[in-house]
Amino acid sequence: MYDVVNDRRGTGYRSRIIDDTMRMAGKTGTSQVRNITAAERARGVTSNADLPWERRDHALFVCFAPYDKPKYAACVLVEHGGGGSTAAAPIARDVMLQAMAGGKPPLEAYPKSDRGRIATQQEELRNTTPETTANLEGEDQA
């Protein structure tokens, strides 16, 4: 499970945690919702993006962290979300980081390629719903 998230060849590698004290281990999964007929297999399986929402695969990811001394575990299921590595794993990573950091996680815990996007999302969240994000910043709520 460690290699799924931390090895470049792992299906969850894009959702890894860089901070050595917070590294997680996990397993991606995809649950097929629909039947794929022999005729469809012969002509090529239709991609999730081209299917109606209710026929798309479910995305799954289970994980624990820190991997060397587990304190937290999570399971994320995104109904009709597609693949576990693209839909469920990033959500689980963010939940785990929030739990381990006790609030807003440090940007340095994310892969460098994600930091700009994550910083923008955190700022948008803070500006959109300041009363519900006070705990992200460690602020007291009145």
Predicted features by range, described:
Residues 1-106:
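Active-site beta-strand/loop architecture of penicillin-binding DD-peptidases
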